[in-house]
């Protein structure tokens, strides 16, 4: 066996050893007790938060006896061995096997009052921002302090969220890796077109017996929005908020759990909409199909460059029967972007809307009474129009993954991935592009 092959195995074993340092006795002490200091109506940050979507209105088991503060965290350390190639003449970044920068989140949960909680997440270290950076925060109301029969009855079914927060568009964002918080994601990376954004606004939910609806309104951009809006090609400089809707059903049918949801997001004009470019952490495929002369943070992902006039719809289906799980995503979106030259004159000239479609299908099987081991497969494809192209481009990805929960808080997972790029222009580094290989990731969440 060659020396470099031995060194790779040793380094991968070191990652495994750093996780398996937990004793066998500790690994079997899976406690179902309540978390000390946890808030009400929340999503746990460990394994028990998997397949939790919107919080429910079920009666809480911890009575409010005063302010409660809980500090949590998410931590990921990844080893990757990827190979990439292109038919373009653009030189590729020369990469080999090695460890990626660890990512970490600090999560602050505060129960402020009965039925009122605060969620604040800080990125301590990510691929894009290796310094501390606030992701966002919100206040969630599941009860109101008015103590009147009308509001008490209303809040049996209603939830209100207000803040600079991750918007609830689609179900896929509940299963994605978010910097150090990778315990919900059975795979090594998010979807190719990663719909995720933090915006300033509010959401109102109504739910009863597994049927729910939601409406949200935000400023339509990831940053503050006090700047004057640029005029478009028609001379209109009006600034619009983003409005989004979601409805679905989540019920147990016999021994199976079945969930179907539909979401729509509309943002006619904002300064800088980032529905498909709002992740400030970065992708998990470091250096993949990246040019030698540049260092990005979204390698392996695709954005259609919609910054204005965005209209998007996502449909999701989830079925769980015993250890078998199915999760599907269909998404279609259209929008346009500003022309850089005209933008300097205060005019946005690009009024030609482009369309993008995305499909993802994944299946998992979780083994054992506690479902501590799983195997998974996912196929993800994107077809999109781009400026200057007469035909749509295509990107497709096949992922095979497996994972092992040593405890509810510690996960070791690995993924083998093949991603191909089709119909890009010869001048584009993605022309005839492909990357493949494996990633191994240790995750801690609490």
Region spans (language model):
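Outer membrane beta-barrel
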Residues: 60-83, 94-223, 237-255, 259, ...
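Outer-membrane beta-barrel pore domains
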Residues: 26-35, 41-46, 93, 138-141, ...
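Short, flexible helix-coil linker/hinge segments at the edges of structured domains or between repeats
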Residues: 175-187, 223-232, 280-289
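Alpha-helix capping and helix-loop boundary segments enriched in small/acidic/polar residues
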Residues: 192, 234-235, 429-430
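Glycine-centered small-residue hotspots that permit tight backbone geometry or close packing
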Residues: 49, 73-75, 105, 282, ...
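Sequence/structural signature of outer-membrane beta-barrel proteins
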Residues: 78-87, 123-127, 146-148, 167-169, ...
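N-terminal periplasmic/intermembrane-space "pro-region" immediately following the signal or transit peptide
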Residues: 2-76, 149
């Amino acid at each position: 066996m060659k020396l470099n092959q031995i060194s790779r195995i040793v380094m991968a074993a070191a990652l495994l050893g750093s996780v398996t340092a937990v004793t066998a006795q500790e690994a079997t002490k899976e406690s179902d007790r309540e978390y000390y200091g946890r808030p009400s109506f929340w999503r746990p940050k460990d394994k028990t938060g998997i397949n939790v979507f919107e919080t429910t209105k079920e009666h809480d088991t911890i009575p409010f006896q005063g302010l409660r503060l809980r500090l949590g965290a998410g931590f990921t350390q990844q080893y990757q061995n990827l190979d990439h190639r292109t038919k373009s003449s653009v030189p590729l970044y020369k990469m080999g096997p090695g460890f990626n920068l660890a990512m970490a989140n600090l999560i602050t949960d505060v129960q402020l009052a009965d039925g009122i909680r605060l969620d604040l997440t800080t990125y301590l270290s990510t691929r894009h921002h290796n310094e501390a950076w606030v992701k966002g925060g919100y206040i969630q109301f599941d009860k109101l302090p008015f103590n009147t029969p009308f509001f008490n009855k209303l809040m049996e079914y209603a939830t209100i969220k207000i803040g600079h927060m991750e918007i609830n568009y689609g179900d896929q964002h509940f299963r994605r890796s978010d910097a150090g918080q990778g315990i919900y994601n059975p795979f090594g990376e998010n979807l190719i077109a990663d719909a995720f954004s933090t915006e300033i606004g509010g959401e109102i939910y109504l739910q009863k017996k597994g049927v729910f609806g939601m409406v949200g309104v935000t400023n339509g951009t990831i940053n503050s929005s006090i700047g004057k809006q640029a005029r478009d090609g028609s001379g209109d400089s009006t600034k619009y908020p983003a409005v989004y809707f979601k409805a679905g059903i989540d019920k147990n049918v016999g021994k199976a759990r079945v969930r179907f949801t539909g979401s729509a997001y509309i943002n006619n004009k904002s300064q800088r909409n980032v529905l498909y470019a709002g992740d400030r952490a970065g992708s998990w495929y470091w250096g993949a199909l990246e040019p030698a002369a540049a260092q990005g943070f979204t390698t392996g992902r695709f954005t259609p460059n919609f910054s204005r006039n965005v209209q998007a719809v996502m449909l999701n289906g989830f079925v769980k029967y015993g250890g078998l799980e199915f999760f599907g995503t269909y998404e279609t979106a259209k929008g346009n972007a500003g022309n850089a030259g005209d933008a300097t004159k205060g005019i946005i000239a690009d009024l030609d809307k482009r369309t993008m479609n995305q499909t993802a299908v994944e299946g998992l099987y979780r083994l054992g009474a506690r479902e501590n081991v799983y195997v998974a497969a996912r196929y993800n494809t994107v077809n999109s129009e781009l400026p200057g192209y007469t035909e749509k481009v295509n990107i497709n990805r096949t992922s095979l993954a497996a994972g092992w929960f040593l405890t509810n808080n510690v996960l070791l997972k690995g993924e083998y991935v093949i991603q191909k790029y089709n119909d890009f222009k010869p001048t584009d580094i993605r022309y005839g592009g492909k990357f493949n290989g494996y990633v191994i990731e240790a995750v801690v969440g609490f």
